[in-house]
Structures are given as C-alpha cells and as structure tokens.
Regions:
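Helix-to-loop junction immediately C-terminal to a conserved catalytic motif
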Residues: 48
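Conserved ABC ATPase signature
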Residues: 135-139, 143
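Conserved ABC ATPase "signature" region
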Residues: 96, 111-131
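The feature captures the beta-strand-to-loop junction immediately N-terminal to the Walker
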Residues: 33-35
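Conserved catalytic motifs of ABC-family nucleotide-binding domains
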Residues: 156
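Catalytic Walker B motif of ABC-type/P-loop ATPase nucleotide-binding domains
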Residues: 160-164
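Conserved ABC transporter NBD signature motif
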Residues: 55-63, 72
Length: 166
C-alpha cells in the first residue's frame, strides 16, 4: 500500500503539490491525468523519493524518508519521461543496470541465476530479448522506451510508476 499524507512539494519555492493526500491499496492501479505543469511528474518524483517534500509518503507503513536508496529501489521502480540511453551499452546491459541498483556490487561483477533470469524475463516481457546484444542507443525511440520499461521490470519492485509511458 502507498499512503501519501499532506504532501506539498515544488520547485524554486513554488508549490506544485499542495497538501495532497490519498492511499492506494496493494493490487490497485492508478492513472494520474492532467495538463502540462499540473504536478504529475512532481508527484511521481516525490513518491519515488527523488524530490523532497513536506508531508509523508509511506510504502507498506514505512516512511520512504527513512529508507535507504537500495531499499527504496526494491519497493519502487520509476520509468521517467526524461531517461537517456547510456552511450555504447547493449540493451541487456541497460536492463541489467536496473537490477544492480538494488545490489551492492557493480554492474559487471558475477551475477547469480536469479539476476540473469530477471533480466531475461523483463526483456521477453517487452519483446526485446532478440535485440539484447544490440547497442541500445541505436534503437528507435519506442524501442528505447521499452528498454527502460524492461529495466524497471528487472528490478522486480513492488510498485511500478510510469511517467509519460506512451
């Protein structure tokens, strides 16, 4: 469950979110719609722990402000609208990076069977397993977006948040 309680946040001293509260039970889906500049991305950044706020965001009863980044990554996977493919990495490497955000070891250190299977499953889910050895920055824009979606899936988070997913 996600609980957002009396959250206010913004940029340069100007609040975009003002005293926002809601809860989202486990297993439920939520779509946030609105015009440009209304706070959709700001809300997702706050919920992912990337933007400080006044108020509290809780996942399964625990405040995200008290979670370490790796712990937060195990709970929440965010696909941002502004993601860029790292230069000269393969599709598989980019997806693997999402998996290793939760680990203490580096990208190219030995992985266990679970890591490899999570990466494969994520790439198969988005239909890119066959392109896993291609340089990711040579793919079309839509394919690159699917790479980042697979990267979030490889984390196997409890909560997936998509910012401008279309």
């Amino acid at each position: 469950m996600i609980e957002v309680s009396h959250v206010s946040a913004g940029y340069d001293g100007q609040d975009v979110l003002k005293d926002l509260s809601f809860s989202l039970p486990q297993g439920e889906n939520l779509a946030i719609l609105g015009p440009n500049g209304c706070g959709k991305t700001t809300l997702l950044r706050v919920m992912a722990g990337l933007l400080p706020c006044r108020g509290d965001v809780r996942v399964d009863g625990r405040s995200i402000a008290r979670m370490k980044p790796r712990e937060l990554a195990a709970h929440i996977g965010l696909m941002s609208q502004n993601m860029q493919i790292p230069f000269d990495y393969t599709v598989e490497d980019v997806v693997r990076m999402g998996r290793y955000r939760m680990r203490r070891r580096g990208l190219f250190e030995a992985e266990n069977r679970e890591d490899g299977q999570a990466v494969r499953d994520a790439l198969e889910t988005v239909g890119l397993w066959e392109l896993r050895n291609r340089t990711a920055n040579t793919l079309s824009g839509g394919q690159q977006q699917r790479v980042f979606l697979a990267r979030v899936f490889a984390q196997q988070p409890e909560i997936v948040m998509l910012d401008e997913p279309t």
